[in-house]
Amino acid sequence: MAEKRPLGPLGPMMYGKLPRLEPDPGPGHSLPLSASSQDSCNYKGAYFSCPIGGTSKAGSERLASWTPYPSLYPTGVAGSPLRGDNLLTNCLLYRPPTEGSEKIQDSSELLPFGPQAHAYPGPPLAAPKPVYRNPLCYGLSTCLGDGGTKRSLDGDWTLVTGPLLPSADPPCPLATAPGKGQPLDGTFLRGLPSGGPGKDSSLPFSPCQAFLEKYRTIQSTGFLASKYTSPYPGDAKQAMSEGPSSPWTQLAQPLGPPCQDAVAAHYPLPPPPQALPCPPSCHPEKQGSYGSLLPLPPLGAHKGAAYQAGGLGSPYLRQQAPQAPYMPPLGIDSYSYSSAPLPAPSPGLKLEPPLAPRCPLDFVPQTLGFPYARDDLSLYGASPGLGGTPPSHSQNSVQPVPQPGAFQRACQPLPASQPCSEPVRPAEKPTPEAQEKMWLPSCRKEQLQPRPNERPGVPIVIRDSPVPRTSPALHPCAKERQSVPQKDARPPSSPPMPVIDNVFSLAPYRDYLDVQTPEPRAERDSAPATSKSQDKDCKGNLPAQDGASRSHCSLREEVALDLSVKKTMAEGVPVKVPSPEVHEKPAEAVDGPGIENTVSGLPGLKKMVTEIPEVTAEATPRTNFHSSVAFMFRKFKILRTAPVPAAIVSSPTTPAPVPAPAPAQPVPNPPSVPVGLQILTQPLPVACFNLALPSPPAIVASPAPASAPPPSPAPAPAPASGPAPSSAQVPTAAPVDSPEQHFTGLHTSLCDAISGSVAHSPPEKLREWLETTGPWGQAAWQDCQGVQGLLGKLLSQLQKFVCTQRCPFPHVVRAGAIFVPIHLVKERLFPKLPPASVDHVLQDHRVELRPTTLSEERALRERALHGCTSRMLKLLALRQLPDIYPDLLGLQWHDCVRRQLGGFDTEARTLSPSEPTVTRDEPESQALAGKLPAPKVKKPGRKPPTPGPEKAEAATGEGSRNPSPSSGASTSPPGPTLRARFRNLLENAWLNGVALPTWGHKASGADRSSPHPQLLGSQTHHL
C-alpha cells in the first residue's frame, strides 16, 4: 500500500535521519534528558524541545542554554549562540519575519536536529504559520511525557487539525526528532525567507512544505545551491534527473515533493518507522548507511502536514524505530544533499574507502555538524557511520517496520530460514511489531547487487547474521543504475533450471555438461527452499538483475554457506574435488570415485563424471533434480560399461572348465578398459572361478593332477592319486560334485603327496628328519611338494563344512554344533595310524570325545556305521578337526618314514604294510587303502615296463627294470643269496628313485598300472 501512495520527496526515511542528541553533550550543553525510560520507542537519548517564538519560555531557555560543540560545527557556526527568537518548532525551525536569513543561518547551524534531512530546497515558504505540532513520536504520549513545556508548544501549532494530530498527544519536543532525525544544518534554514514564517500566512501549504520550497529555491545557501532546481511541486523524476553530483548524490534521495498537504489525516499517526537508510532510487547496497542523508524535518512536523509522500500517516507505522544517527559531512556546505540521485555515481564516492561487496555502506563524515550521541548504537540499528562497528542486530531495540515512502525501497528482512544474500540494514530485525515487514511482498523479491564502482563508507560486515535479508523492490532509478554494473558482471555459469514441478530434463544440461565453464555451478539461491519462491518473484520483477544477483548471491554463499562449493570453484575445471560430494552424498560416494576411474579413458564421459559430484554437492535447494541427475548418470554409466564386461567375462567363461585360473587371466588383460569396468567384470570371473573350483576336485583323482603338474620335477604326486582310486574310481565317478568325494579326494591326494615325498627321500635324510623334527614331523612333511596347497584346500573345506553346517559325513548336530564320530578320523581318514597315536594327538590338543546318546548312536548306525563299536562312535566336534588335522598328517608322515626305515628286512616290510591293507579291505576304506603303500608314488617310473610290479619278489624283474644298478647280480640263484640281492636292488632302486615293490598284491599291482590312463582321461574330461 505504501508503494501506491504518491511519490514525494519526503518519506519516513527522512524522519529516520534525525540525529540522537547525547544525553550528556558536555559542559556547554544544558540539554536536559527527557524521560527516556518512558520512550516506548526504545529511544534513550535526550529530547530537545523548542518553543515557537516565545510561547514556552522553558523551551526557549532550553534552546538558548544549549551551545553546540565548537569542534563539531563549522568555524562560522561554532560560536554563534542559539537565537531564542528563532522558531524551533517541534518539526520546523522557522524564523520570525523580522529577521534576515543570515541570522537564521547562524541559528540554524547550531541546531542539531530538525528537518535537516531535507537536502533539497523547497519553494518559498508561503505559510508563515507552522502547521505541524505533532512530535516525532507521532502522538505517543508515553514517548516523552506530558511536560508543561511541551504542552506550551501546542498553542503555536494552531493550524493542526484534530484528525491530523490529536491534540491530546503531547508533541514530543524536537529532540525526539533528533533522536531519529538529522541535525539541522545551517543550510536548512538558509533558505528560510526573511518574512516567510509569520503566523498570519494562510497558504494551504504546511509551513514545512513552504519552508522546504523556499529552502529549495535559495541558490546561495551553500550546499543546496544549484542542486535542487526543480520546483517544489516538480516531478520526482525530474528531481531525480537533476540530482547533484556531490559525493552524497549516490545516497538515496526522496523523489517526491517535499511535502504534500494534509492527506495523512486518513491514517492514524503511529510512530515513524525506522527510516530506510537507502531509498530504492539510489544505492541498494547502502542499506546500513544513512541512505537518504536528506535533512528531514521531524516526523511529527511533517506528519501534521499529511506527509503522504513519506507515507508517514500510513497505518503501517508502529513505534518509532531507533534510527541510525545522521552524521553531517565535514562542513555544512561540504556536501550537498540532493533530492534526486544522479544516474551516474558521483566521483566523490570514489574517494571513500572501497567497501567489501554485500556490506552496507555508510559515509563517515570527517566533522559532525551537530553533537550526536552514539552511546547506544543498538538504538540506531547498525549505524556504521558513527565510525564504530555498529551492533549488527540489536536484539532488545524495538525496530518497527520501516514505512517506506513511495520513493523508498522497503528493506525488509526475510524469514530466518533464508540466508542473507545481500547487504541489508543489519539492525532491521523483525520485532513483534515488525511482523508486518512482510506487508510488501516485493520487498523480499529483490536481491541487492553491490555496485563495484560505488564502495564509499565503512563496510558493515554481517558475519553470522542468521536473519536472511533481501533488499526491497528497486526503484526504476536504482534498476537503471544496477543494470550498468551487471553488464560487466559474469552471467551465471550454470544452465537454466530444468526442473518444472519435479519433472526434470537433462536437455538444458547437455551443453553445460559437455562444455564446462570455470564455475559450472547450477543457479544457487542464498536460501534453500523459501528462496526458490523468492527467486521466482525476483525473476519476474528484476529480469535484468537476475544474472548478476545470482552471481553475487553465490559469491556470498561461498564465503558463508557452502565451503565445499567454494573449494571446487577455486580448484577450477580439471579437478572437481569429489571429496565434498563424498561427504555430502554418502550414497554416491561409492559411485563418485568409481565413475571417475571408469571414465578415465573416456574424455567425454570424464567431464560429466567430474561434474556430477559438483552438481550434487550444491543440490541443497534442488535435491530432487540433482539426485535425479546423478541417478541418470549412474544409469548411463552402467549401460555404457555393461557390454564391455559381458565380452570380457564371456571369453573366460567358455574355456573355464579346462583351466581354473583361466578366468582370472582374461580379466586383467583388459586393464586397458577403465578400472570402473573391472569393478563390474570382476565379480563375474570370481563367480566363474568358484563354479569351476568344485568341479575338478569332484573326482577323487582330479585334484591331484591339478596340483601335481606344477611340481614337474617330481612325477610322484600325479600318480599318487592312482593307487587306491583304481577301485574307488567307479563309485566316485557317478557323484561328481559330492562334497564327501571332494574332501576325500583332497585328503587322499595329500596323503599320497606325503608318502611320495618320503619314498623319494634317501634313508639318511629320513633318519635326520626323524631325529630333528618333533614327534609328528610337521616341519618335514610340510616341505613336501604340493602339500601346502592341498592342505590349505582341505582345511578350507573343513571350515566350509563348519560354517555352512552341511557336513557330508555322518554327523550329529548338538546346539547348532556339528559332531562327527571318531570313526571318521581313525578308520576313514587315517586308517594306517595306530589308534593310540590318534588319541595322543587328541590329548595334546585337549580335544574331548563325547559319548553319543542312544538316539544319536541309533541314527549313526542306521546311516552308515553299521558295525562300529561304541568307542568308534564317540563324537568329535567338527570345528576342532582343522586343529588336529595337521598333526594327524604329521603322524601319517612319521609312520611312512618309520616304515621306510624300519627294518630293511624285506619280508618284514612286505608283510607289515600289506596286513593293514588286507584288513582294511572294507568298501568304506578302499579309497584310503592306497595311502599306506607310499612307494606307489613312483608308478610313472614303472609305467613303461608294466610287468615290473608283477615280479615284486623276482630279482630278474627288478634287474630288468633297473639293469644298470643290478645287472651283475641278476643271475644269482634264489634263496638267501636272492634275498641279499633283493636288498641290494631295493637300495639301488631307492637311490635311483624307483618305486619299491614291497607288497605282494600282484593283482592290485596289475590293476594299478591300468587305471592310470583312466585317471588321466577323467582329469582331462573334468578339468
Curated annotation (Swiss-Prot):
Source domain of life: Eukaryota
Phosphoprotein found in the keyword field: yes
Residues with Phosphothreonine modification: T389
UniProtKB keywords: Acetylation, Phosphoprotein
Modified residues (N6-acetyllysine): K17
Biased composition (Low complexity): 963-972
Annotated positions of the Phosphoserine modification: S206, S383, S493, S494, S912, S964, S972
Composition bias, Polar residues: 391-400
Segments of skewed composition (Pro residues): 706-722
Basic and acidic residues biased stretches: 425-436, 443-454, 477-490
Region described as Disordered: spans on this chain: 1-35, 381-501, 518-551, 703-742, 907-980, 1002-1023
Any one Gene Ontology cellular component term annotated for this protein: cytosol
Protein name, entry field: Uncharacterized protein C15orf39 homolog
Annotated organism of origin: Mus musculus (Mouse)
